[in-house]
Amino acid sequence: MSTKAIEIKQQKADVITEQLKNSVSTIIVDYRGLTVAQVTELRKQLREAGVEFKVYKNTLVRRSAAAAGIEGIDEFLTGPNAIAFSTEEVVAPAKIIADFAKENEALEIKAGIIEGTVTSAEDVKAIASLPSKEGLISMVLSVLQAPIRNFAYAVKAVGEQQGGEETAAEEA
């Protein structure tokens, strides 16, 4: 192999290593059996969520995972794989891929790397069932707002009740 080819492969491996290090959620899937149109649709959905979806050689991914300090991923790197990298959202790629896999049985979730920890396909599917970051924030905010809202309703009711008593006293 020429030194130029080795250099190109090393550059690709460096890119993959950086993606693995910077990613909070990485999902590995087997895409065999999907049509080009289906893969394009999946890429579109992932891109809209800010997730990068790439196909790399398994050897490069193995080297990159070792360089990034990720262990236990080798067993999942067999056959054709595609990898979804998300640097911002843990749940989004898992949710999009799990939903897509329900509609397209040819797509198989193999494993995930969530915040540096290798997880099984079952764990990825469990993460997919969680609400998104925005959903969790809205849940927390509604829980925090409930006591304030109830207090405001109580103050309003007391004010209306006192206003009603004053009107009754004026009429008498």
Swiss-Prot record:
Coiled coil: none annotated. GO terms for biological process: translation. Transmembrane segments: none annotated. Pfam families: Ribosomal_L10. It comes from the Bacteria. SUPFAM superfamilies: Ribosomal protein L10-like. One of its GO terms (cellular component) is ribonucleoprotein complex. GO terms for molecular function: large ribosomal subunit rRNA binding. Keywords: Ribonucleoprotein, Ribosomal protein, RNA-binding, rRNA-binding. PANTHER family: 39S RIBOSOMAL PROTEIN L10, MITOCHONDRIAL. Forms part of the ribosomal stalk, playing a central role in the interaction of the ribosome with GTP-bound translation factors. Belongs to the universal ribosomal protein uL10 family. HAMAP family: Ribosomal_uL10. Part of the ribosomal stalk of the 50S ribosomal subunit. The N-terminus interacts with L11 and the large rRNA to form the base of the stalk. The C-terminus forms an elongated spine to which L12 dimers bind in a sequential fashion forming a multimeric L10(L12)X complex. NCBIfam families: PRK00099.1-1 (NF000955). This is Large ribosomal subunit protein uL10. It comes from Macrococcus caseolyticus (strain JCSC5402) (Macrococcoides caseolyticum). The gene is rplJ.
